Amino acid sequence: MRRLFTSESVTEGHPDKICDQISDAILDEILKKDPYARVACETAVTTGLVLVMGEITTECYVDIPRIARDVIRDIGYTRAKYGFDADTCAVITSIDEQSPDIAMGVNKALEARRGELTDAEIEAIGAGDQGLMIGFACDETEELMPMPIMLAHKLARRLAEVRKNGTLSYLRPDGKTQVTVEYEEDRPVRVDSVVVSAQHAPEVDHDTIEKDIIEHVVNVIIPENMMDKNTKIFVNPTGRFVLGGPQADSGLTGRKIIVDTYGGYARHGGGAFSGKDPTKVDRSASYAARYVAKNIVAAGLAKKCEVQVAYAIGVATPLEVEINTFGTGKISDEKISEIVKKVFDLRPAAIIRDLDLRRPIYRQVAAYGHFGRHDLDLPWEKTDRVDILRKLAGI
C-alpha cells in the first residue's frame, strides 16, 4: 500500500524560532552561572519589539536585553530595512520568581548539596508538572528519525547556510520548508513534493530565486535517488516573499513543537521545550523518551518505537512507561517495557543526572530540531544502552 506523509520545518529567522532561540539563550546564560536555577522563560516578538517574560529563580544576574539582541544579530536581522533589527528593536522584560507552590514539589531533596544524590533523594525530587511526554525513533534514516522531518530540517538549514556564506546573498532570514515523502509498505520510496519559501530582497525576480534555490538548496539536500520526473518542487509559490520575520508575523516561544520533534510522524504530549530548565519534565522527559526509543531501535529490538511517559506534579516515579513498536518488535511490547524499566531510570532527577542536563546546551537545538542532530553531541542521541538492551532481550 502506498501513502504520502508530509513534514515541515522553519529557518532560524522565522518569528517563532527567534523566540525559541532567545528563550534558550537566556536559559544557557543562566545555567553557565547557576546550574540549579529554575527557569521558565517565554519570548514574544513583533515589529520592533521583543518581550521576555516568565518565572526565573536564580542566584545570578544575566543581561537579558543584551542576550536577546545577540541572538537576533546572529540570526541575521542586522538592518533596519528588514523591519526588525538587533540594534533598534525595543526589549522589554517582565520576570517573576517561580511559584513556591511548584517549587515545594521539586525542592524536597537535598538538591542544593551539589553532590551525588542517593536513591532516596532522587525519589524525593518530584516532577515539576503533570503531563505526558513522547519519544520516538525509526530506522528510516541514519539519524533514526522519520525521513520527512529530517529532509525538511536539512533544507531549512541549507537555506540559512547559503544566505550566510554569500552563495545567495539576496536571501533574508525568514523561511519555511516542507517535504512530502511517498511510502510503500511503510518504507520511504520517493520524495513526492518539496516546498521552499525563502524571504528575499525586493529587487530579485522570481525566476532567479526559483532556479537558484533548486540548484543550491533542493538538489544539494534531497537525495537524487529519491526524486524522479514526477517530483513537484515549489519555490515561493505565492511569487513573492519580501515582507517577513517579526515585521510580517508576530512570534512566540513554543509554537513550533511539531517542528521541534518528529514532524507529526509521532504523537506529541503538548509541552514545548525552549526556555525551560531540566526540572521541567516537558523538556527533560521528552529527551529521555527519545533516548529510550533511539536505543531500542539502534539495538534492533524494533524498526519503529514510540515511548510514552506520564508524571504527576511532585511525584518522582512515572505514572506510566508505555512502549509501542507498531508491530515491528522482535519481542513483545510488554517485554520491551519491562526491560526499559530495568535499564532506564525515568525519575526526573535521574534523567537530569544520567543525561547531564544542567549544562548550557539548549540554544543550539532551538532551531532545526531537538532530535536526530548528528551535527551536535547531544546526550539523548547517544546509543550507549544498546548492548544491555540486546542482552536482556536475548537477541
Curated annotation (Swiss-Prot):
Q: What is this protein called?
A: S-adenosylmethionine synthase
Where is K(+) bound in this sequence? Answer: 42
The lineage's top-level taxon is Bacteria
Keyword Transferase attached: yes
Q: Which GO terms describe its molecular function?
A: ATP binding; magnesium ion binding; methionine adenosyltransferase activity
Chief localization class?
Answer: cytoplasm
Q: Where does L-methionine bind?
A: 55, 98, 249, 280
Which residues participate in Mg(2+) binding?
Answer: 16
Task: Extract the Pfam families matched here.
Answer: S-AdoMet_synt_C (PF02773), S-AdoMet_synt_M (PF02772), S-AdoMet_synt_N (PF00438)
Q: Which keywords does UniProt give here?
A: ATP-binding, Cytoplasm, Magnesium, Metal-binding, Nucleotide-binding, One-carbon metabolism, Potassium, Transferase
State the PANTHER family in the record.
Answer: S-ADENOSYLMETHIONINE SYNTHETASE
> Could you tell me what this protein does?
Catalyzes the formation of S-adenosylmethionine (AdoMet) from methionine and ATP. The overall synthetic reaction is composed of two sequential steps, AdoMet formation and the subsequent tripolyphosphate hydrolysis which occurs prior to release of AdoMet from the enzyme.
Cofactor binding remark? Binds 2 divalent ions per subunit. Binds 1 potassium ion per subunit.
The cofactor named in the record is: Mg(2+); K(+)
Q: Where is this region: Flexible loop?
A: 98-108
Where is the protein localized?
Answer: Cytoplasm
Could you tell me the EC number(s) of this protein?
2.5.1.6
